[in-house]
Swiss-Prot record:
GO terms for cellular component: cytoplasm. GO terms for biological process: biotin biosynthetic process. Belongs to the class-III pyridoxal-phosphate-dependent aminotransferase family. BioA subfamily. It is found in: Cytoplasm. Substrate binds at residues 150, 296, 331, 426. This is Adenosylmethionine-8-amino-7-oxononanoate aminotransferase.
Length: 461
């Protein structure tokens, strides 16, 4: 289809309300319109190529136009594109559920599908709450999470989140819970570490964890869940949980009979360097989390699919006679769609055939080594992350850690310079966000980090 490029730009500004975008500024600026993708690159309507340094918002795993995933979608489309999962099965959804149970911790045995991460979290919330109701424990109406946590933009997901910037305006609509202070090592309320690296070198008493445990112990009888992101707080600015934090919370949940939900929508499928963050011995011993949320990379970033996994114990509480109305009343039109599940099956096959988790380890090591060079720059306060999820926090004053005002758009100033160098990056406030695809090459890693170094120097900060 040959459409005039100027007309596309005009219609984009005239008809589309873009997410997380100040449309006044967007309508006044030159808009980037992507036409296609090749490998790790996005290509705009003018043929310009950009390294996709945020994996199209943290979902693309193996680059764009990966033939195995596209062929799987095409082959399924030749059979059937969609039939309902309400009281009726379909082949790809069954095969994928078995596969997910096989590759996640063994105590997670049941799969509930949805189309995006926020819905996966909504389902987890409903499962946890109704579990206690069916158990006869109807007094549990609160949750516990951390301030600045992010779990999606639907009402339930916003409620258990804690982002004042994103969701503050909706507070009157949200249900109530308790929010602990986040384990934000760079801006720790208990210590004055120079940066996250210094905290990791020196260690601490984990006061943030103790605060969370105290909250769980104090409110256990009124709480139906504790929910955390898997190893790193993504939208808060790529803030890693200190080693042992999540395991400590899981232990407290087990000791106080509180369901623990781990949101790995963003962190699952290799992002933190492991297939899943919850794939560690301590959590396996505790048989936690009770509920696991997956999404984003589940289809390689090609189609919208998410999944909520849980245990036999939780699932069994929902079993009964039809008239008892114990069933989980949740489900959307495209739940368990065949095209989506086929894309996910092809994605998981790539993980197996190409030994992806083992092969990305040297690239992750190189990535973090190259990023350390940024710390010498005047306005780089902190470089932090896990695996291929990294945040670089820009500050007005490195000694005092004074942040730039939100409206100064420090991160976007760097993003504009990167775009000139053929790299697409979307920041969050003053934090440069890097979430490259797992398929990024060593050469591309070095170019990305070198270009970022220069972009920060060139930006008007």
């Amino acid at each position: 289809m040959n459409i005039d490029k100027n007309l596309l730009e005009k219609w984009d500004k005239e008809y589309i309300w873009h997410p997380y975008t100040q449309m006044k500024e967007y309508r006044e600026s030159k808009n980037l319109i992507i036409e296609r993708g090749e490998g790790n690159y996005l290509i705009d309507i003018y043929g310009n190529k950009y390294l996709d340094a945020v994996s199209s918002i943290w979902c693309n795993l193996f680059g764009h136009s990966r033939k195995e995933i596209i062929e799987a979608i095409k082959n399924q489309a030749d059979k059937i594109c969609h039939s309902t999962l309400l009281g009726c099965g379909n082949v790809p959804s069954i095969l994928l559920a078995k596969k997910l149970v096989d590759i996640t911790p063994k105590h997670l045995t049941k799969v509930f599908y949805s189309e995006d991460g926020a819905e996966a979290v909504e389902i987890a919330i409903k499962m946890a709450y109704q579990y206690y109701v069916l158990r006869g424990d109807k007094g549990r109406t609160k949750f516990i999470s951390v301030k600045e946590g992010y779990h999606g933009d639907t009402v339930g997901a916003m409620s258990v989140g804690g982002s004042e910037l994103f969701h503050g305006v909706f507070k009157p609509l949200l249900f109530k819970g308790y929010h602990a202070n986040p384990p934000y090592c760079y801006r720790c309320k208990y210590h004055n570490f120079k940066d996250t690296d210094e905290r990791n070198e020196k260690g601490c008493e984990m006061e943030c964890l103790n605060e969370m445990i105290s909250l769980i112990e104090k409110h256990a009888e009124e709480v139906f869940c504790v929910i955390l992101e898997g190893g790193i707080m993504g939208s808060a600015g790529m803030i890693p949980y200190p080693d042992g934090y999540i395991e400590g919370v899981a232990k407290a949940c087990k000791e106080n009979d509180v369901i623990f939900i781990l949101d790995e929508v963003a962190t699952g499928f290799g992002r933190t360097g492991k297939m899943f963050f919850c794939d560690n011995e301590e959590l396996k011993k505790l048989e936690k989390p009770d509920i696991l949320c997956l999404g984003k990379g589940l289809t390689g970033g090609y189609l919208p699919l998410a999944a909520t996994l849980t245990t036999d114990e939780i699932y069994n509480q929902f079993l009964g006679e039809f008239g008892e109305s114990k069933q989980l009343y949740h489900g959307h039109t495209y739940t368990g769609n065949q095209l989506l599940c086929s894309a996910a099956l092809a994605t998981l096959e790539i993980f197996e055939k190409e030994n992806v988790i083992e092969n990305i380890q040297p690239k992750i090591k190189l990535f973090h080594k190259e990023l350390r060079k940024l710390k010498e720059l005047e306005h780089v306060g902190d470089v932090r992350g896990r695996g291929f999820m990294v945040g670089i926090e820009l500050v007005k004053d490195k000694e005092t850690k004074e942040p730039y005002p939100y409206g100064y758009k420090a991160g976007y100033r760097v993003a504009e310079k990167l775009l000139e160098k053929g790299i697409y990056m979307r920041p969050i406030g003053n934090v440069i966000i890097l979430v490259p695809p797992l398929s990024i090459t060593e050469k591309e890693i070095i170019y990305l980090c070198d270009a970022l170094y220069e972009a920060i120097k060139e930006a008007d900060l």
